[in-house]
């Protein structure tokens, strides 16, 4: 009886230790394959199209400025815009970014987040100040 108790306790502890994992949310493997981490624009209105190398099942999550976050709550949204920035998923492997003219005397910074499952990819967008 005592051996059975020890055996069951051992199996239970073994099961608990095996089932625990240290997976961190957002630390998935790169399934997007976008090599560009930073995009630089001059102060005038400008645009760029970026291409992904890997997956095509990603979606736009948010764009943010220093003080505002523009977030989507649907996987089907293809466009996010706000603060003078327009981001669109134009194809299965392409993302289009357009920025309005910077009329301030300060550099503008935006962050765009795209997501594929548990993997998040951040693109930093920097626009020069008006000269």
Question: Where in the sequence are the language-model features?
Answer:
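Short, solvent-exposed loop/linker segments at the N-terminal edge
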Residues: 39-44
